Amino acid sequence: MKQATRSLNLPKPIAAYFTADKGNGEAVSQCFTDNAVVKDEGHTHKGRPAIREWKTDASAKYEYTCEPLACEEKDGKTVVTSHLVGNFPGSPVDLRFFFTLEGGKISSLEITP
């Protein structure tokens, strides 16, 4: 994945996630706690190995760019709205990334349209 750059004041673990999200599943998984949970496209991925596999598979399947547009705090979560463009069904699309942080890492992420 190619990363578009935009000046947002993202919390460090979330900024690290978007920086790592360039097709490197291992780098992405290191942004998460050991027992983190990711929910995306109707699937739940639990723990770093499953998160690494999720990101590696998604990056191999599609080419896309992701540009974070907005960031807000809501109900204890950090919500980042991002614009994605690529060779996936429904492109382009704005997605919302609901992050929960714990100890300087991401403990949960849910991605929704």
Label each PLM-derived region with a short phrase.
Residues 1-26, 30:
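Short, low-complexity N-terminal intrinsically disordered segments enriched in polar/charged residues
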Residues 2-3, 53, 57-113:
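A beta-strand edge to alpha-helix "cap/lid" segment located at domain peripheries
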Residues 29-30, 39-40, 67:
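Short, hydrophobic secondary-structure boundary micro-motifs
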Residues 36-46:
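A short gly/proline-enriched turn/hairpin at secondary-structure junctions
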Residues 43, 49, 110-111:
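Short clusters of small/polar residues that mark proteolytic maturation junctions
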